[in-house]
Amino acid sequence: TGKENGPKFNPFFIPKMISDIAAGQISIMYGFHGPNYATCSACATSTNAIADAFNLIRLGKANVIVSGGSEAAIAACGVGGFNAMHALSTRNDSPETASRPFSASRDGFIMGEGGGCLVLEELEHAKARDAKIYAEVAGVGMSADAHHLTASHPEGLGAKLVMLNALEDAEMKPEEVDYINVHGTSTPVGDISEAKAIKEVFGQHAYELNISSTKSMTGHLLGAAGAVESIASILAIKNGIVPPTINHEEGDNDENIDYGLNFTFNKAQKREVNVALSNTFGFGGHNACVIFKKYAE
């Protein structure tokens, strides 16, 4: 039998392996009895989780949902697997400058670890308990590239569609958006395709936007990226400060990227941000987008 002749397993082997246990632990710890599950869409995961929470609340299935994501894949199998795919930067002599989205010398992403959670709440419920409201979720979008297992569509078709879907859901015009926290992983193909998609969706207004990739500072947080970058977008609204895309060097320009776009290179910029849009894209062609807007009392 397996008990007599097979390998010995820790009784926590299965619970520690399945991703839904993270959501389960939060439910157990705080006594939450509402919808409880985990989403999985690679690097779009926690944005999809936020979208799910938003949809459940507006469907009347819950008043409050804790939603987010975490990832800790800096281990031999995680780094080795991404390295075998040639997805990681090889700038090993200067790792702190290796994540350089939208620069010509970018050569792959840097892995990070982290997590983030947001408390999403039905507006009247939040007001009734005098909650501190940082921003409102205005709309969400989802799409699929239907192109390749790991590479984004070279023309950014999925990225374009997901932003249009989110704008439609929010009942907003492109001209209302002030800041885009881009997926921007510092990969040769992905950054070009996302920049193309932004120009197609926003037209001339693309040149009035602030655009930045906080992955230049955090590394790629994989399944946690959407949650952490949503928080960065919300704080840009709250504080009127757009975080930068660091590590860009003078003249390090890619001929396939339009530098008339304001990528907020190297230094945070003050501006009023009433609406912020956050993109996350994942292996498998998963695209997710969430739009936040300033809360007007």
Residue ranges and their predicted role:
Residues D93-A170, Y179, E297:
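Condensing-enzyme catalytic core mediating Claisen C-C bond formation in acyl metabolism
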Residues N36-S41, A62-S70, K132-V140, E175-V182, ...:
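Beta-strand segments within the central parallel beta-sheet cores of soluble alpha/beta enzyme folds
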Residues Q25-M29, T45-H125, A225-E297:
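Conserved beta-strand-centric core segments of catalytic alpha/beta enzyme folds
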Residues A42, T185-T187, M217-G223, T280-N287:
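Glycine-rich phosphate/pyrophosphate-binding beta-alpha loops
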Residues H147-A159, T185-F202, L221-V228, L261-N262:
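Short glycine/threonine-rich loop-to-helix capping motif typified by GTGT followed
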Residues A22, A49, E121-E122, E155-E171, ...:
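Short, well-ordered amphipathic alpha-helical segments that serve as non-catalytic structural scaffolds
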Residues G31, R58-L59, K127-A128, E168-E171, ...:
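Residue-level signal for alpha-helix termini/capping positions
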Residues T1-D52, K61, M85-I110, K196-A227:
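Conserved catalytic cysteine-centered active-site region
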